[in-house]
A protein has these predicted regions:
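Short secondary-structure boundary/capping segments
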Residues: 7, 24-25, 45
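Short beta-strand segments in beta-sandwich/barrel cores
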Residues: 13-18, 32-33, 41, 61
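Short histidine-centered beta-strand/loop micro-motifs
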Residues: 1-2, 19, 44-46
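Short, conserved beta-strand element in jelly-roll/cupin
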Residues: 2-17
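Short acidic-glycine-tyrosine-enriched beta hairpin
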Residues: 21-36
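Conserved beta-strand segments that form the floor/walls of ligand-binding pockets within enzyme
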Residues: 9, 34, 55
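Ligand-binding loop in jelly-roll beta-barrel domains
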Residues: 28, 37-63
Length: 63
């Protein structure tokens, strides 16, 4: 990842989102998280229920 941005939108369920240097974010249905994508990140589903999410990523480069 080089200078772009990302957004996560939870369509259904709950997930925990981890951004390097930040406390974990507990996201639920309809929650949104926006961050620069050069920050280390990962997510997990800590429940037995399925999670559906939409992730959008931008690039600083023109294509």
């Amino acid at each position: 990842h080089h200078g772009g941005e990302e957004m996560v939108f939870v369509l259904e369920g709950q997930l925990t989102f981890y951004l390097e240097g930040h406390k974990p974010y507990k996201l639920e249905t309809y929650d949104t998280l926006y961050y620069p994508n050069y920050i280390g990140h990962r997510w997990s589903n800590d429940s037995d229920e399925p999670v559906r999410m939409l992730m959008v990523s931008t690039s600083p480069y023109n294509f």
